[in-house]
Structure formats: structure tokens, C-alpha cells
Amino acid sequence: MNLIQTLEAEEIARLNKTIPDFSAGDTVIVNVNVVEGSRKRVQAYEGVVIAKRNRGLNSGFIVRKISSGEGVERTFQTYSPLIASIEVKRRGDVRRAKLYYLRERSGKSARIKEKLPARTKAAAASAA
């Protein structure tokens, strides 16, 4: 591990952020710290992750949502101090790492199938 990777790993450990395991296709709720004048509040941004970029401290992800009939995308830096928390609401079952094709789709064709948790042998035996 070189010096830059070591420094980035130390900085990530110092930030002590709990980032859930999510990927493209998942529906997430990102709570963002918003400063308006002297007031500070938390704003929730809910949408589908269409891209995730894993670059250590420079990691980021793009969340897309439909707001009053118009598609809105927002890029978040994973370790940004503006992000209060990230919550995974729903797992999506997709076959691509980048879901940029959703930009051209609307309505039912833009839906993503839900990924159901894998059945264990004990659960399968009790169901039979």
C-alpha cells in the first residue's frame, strides 16, 4: 500500500462514517445537511442509485428521482460532511453497474425489480 492510499485509509477511519452497503439499482434515502442563512436543517433526498464510483476517499454516487414529472439527478460524495446519513430503503435487481439508460425511460419501463433476500435451507425446509 503506497503513501497516498495509507493517508486516505487513515482519513476514512478518522471520519468514522457508517456507510451502508448499497449498489446501482437500490433505492436510498440520503439525508443532507442544508444551511440556509443561519439555519441548519436536514433534507431527505430519496431516489434510485444509477451509478456508484469507488475511489477511496473520492467515492461518490448518483441518485435519480422523479420530482413533479421531471427527472432530477444529484451526485453525492460518499464521505462528504454534508451527508448526515444514508439509508437503503429497497434493494434493486439489475444487471448493469451504471443505469444511465434510465434517463431515456419514463413510467413503467423505468421501474426496477426488487431483489428478494436469498432463501436459506432452513427456510426452504420449513416451507415444504
Curated annotation (Swiss-Prot):
SUPFAM superfamilies: Translation proteins SH3-like domain. GO terms for molecular function: structural constituent of ribosome. Signal peptide: none annotated. Keywords: Ribonucleoprotein, Ribosomal protein. The keyword Cytoplasm does not apply. GO terms for biological process: translation. Belongs to the bacterial ribosomal protein bL19 family. This protein is located at the 30S-50S ribosomal subunit interface and may play a role in the structure and function of the aminoacyl-tRNA binding site. HAMAP family: Ribosomal_bL19. This is Large ribosomal subunit protein bL19. The gene is rplS.
